[in-house]
Amino acid sequence: MHWASTDKCLPLLPTNPNYSIYTLRHHMLELVIRAALEAGRAIMDIYTHPDTDWEVERKADNSPLTLADRRSHAVIAQALEQTPYPLLSEEGAHQPYDERKDWEALWIVDPLDGTKEFLKRNDEFTVNIALVQHGTPTLGVIYVPAKHVLFWGTQADGAFRAEVDPETLERSEVKQIPLTAEEIGECPYRVVASRSHLSEETQTLIEDLRTSHPDLDLVSAGSSLKLCLVAEGKADIYPRDRKSVV
């Protein structure tokens, strides 16, 4: 398959059949990282613009949908068209189960995770992109555009965190995670929970945890930022029941 970019802002995927699996994986990861960063930039253009129209639509499940959701989706969808895998996106076209049940690999995307946090303007929203192969996540990127922090990882190479320059989108201060105990330091038993979707079941679980961890510190956060806090060692557990929303 010939993979090539139609956007000069996005890296080309290699077409040379002699490239190693490692090189192909690296180019794929770089394309996805760049897509997440460009999507984050599109979101921030709307988030910071003084004349932004904050009109909100409602999807079938009554969750909010904004212009930023759509812009981010468009950026990511264009980038992922270069790859041989189909896209299942929170804001994309509905894919019937009979069609996608036979997909061996696919991209799963939430172009703006934490739309409620975006509307509250508390900076706790993310761009999420994952490649799932045979039911297993093998590559993932989470970008927190308002905080200029990027997380990424692959099944083969592990997970990493970096700071991002919002102007150039260049990465710096790259660290592999999980971090060492020395880097994390001493802290109380920390539980991270949803800021907008904290259910009674989750609250009960947290109180149960408090009996064995009297020093429990509850931290509320939005979107997939909660998972990033656990990955960084800034939280010990993210409890959620089946009815809750990430």
Language-model features and meaning:
Residues 43, 69, 80, 115, ...:
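Residue-level signal for inorganic ion chemistry
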Residues 130-228:
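Acidic beta-strand-loop-alpha-helix segment within the catalytic core
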